[in-house]
Amino acid sequence: MSYLSTASSPVQSLYVHVPFCAAKCEYCAFFSEPSSGEQMNRFVDALIREMELVASSLKPRTIFFGGGTPSLLSMAQWRRVLEAMERLCLLGADEWTVECNPATVSAEKARLLREHGVNRISMGVQSLDEGLLDRLGRIHSREMVFKSFDRLRAAGFDNINLDLMFAIPGQTMAIWKATMAEAIAMGSEHLSCYEVIYEEDTPLYEQLKAGEFDVDEAVACAMYDELIDTADAAGFVQYEVANFARHAGDPVAELPSHACQHNINYWRGGACQALGPSATGYVDGRRIRNIANTERYCGQLALGQRAHESVEQLSPLASAGETAAFGLRMNTGWPFRLFEQTTGFDLRAGWAGDMQRVVDSNWGVCTDERFHLTRQGMRYADSVAEWFIRPEA
């Protein structure tokens, strides 16, 4: 599914970045800052103003509140946001996800979100091992995960994603297997499982540079293989490098029914309006990034202006290259007809050499209808993506 947009049609996908966290995790390179009541109130004022500026160009079928920690917003702050969205006719999305930290999910807040149309929760679990949670700087305990999950179910959420991480320093295969087993036993509809990435300017990266631990690529590969096998045995369908979902309907459908439609829109090159500090959207061939500074973001919106840091007009070929790269993260790869409908380019003509390079590496398969990565190729999807990008275009 691709929620494409033209200058005359409304954008059907909305992302909102809530930049506040109770504490910065050791691995996190996303823009966030410590929560502060007054600053959070100013942010809500600015966000509502930004919504007002773009509402006429929006008819969202998917909404995603990410962060940061959106669940940190107070009940009063959430009510203000939800009331504004109702006034601006932004409610009623087919899929509306809110990211939550298990330490910040109250029964009252869960009910409020569900009553206003939020129908999908993504909970940042990362691990169910207390030692690793401390290692990552997470503020929640394993017990909070189970209690928050039950609260969400009681509030009526029947589509819950659990975020997990593997190849964490100090994580053994036994710990990883135990975490997967417990997470699956909870009965969630979706799993997002990411290998730890060592981003510059994060504590974990500095610890790696200082020699406090080593990275074992063989262990990471083994954990990824174990993830795929374990998820499959439990009835999850892998539909993207790091994402697994259950079927609620036709078991032979190309995509599982609980696949995240908002993210699929990204991977399929669809338009997305992005609001909040540091948020990056894609509309009418332009990549639009907001200022990664909450104070400046709020100040700009107080003047009635969008808080853009940059607006980059992509050439058709550059846009198609990015779309090719992102779309190959999905297990179904790119059907040639769909790629041409989406981008206007023939994948077989413009990327023939790149596809052959992937096939020769045993990382990809090319049929008459589509090009997709193999199981081994999915492990190296980021490397493959670099071959398909056309930055000089």
Where are these regions (language model features)?
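C-terminal scaffold of the Radical SAM
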Residues: 3-13, 32-54, 58-345
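Local cysteine-cluster metal-coordination motifs and their immediate loop/turn environment
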Residues: 17-32
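Short amphipathic alpha-helical interaction segments
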Residues: 345-359
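A short, conserved structural fragment
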Residues: 359-369
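Minor-groove-contacting beta-hairpin "wing" of winged helix-turn-helix DNA-binding domains
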Residues: 370-374
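Short, amphipathic alpha-helical interaction segments positioned at domain boundaries
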Residues: 376-393
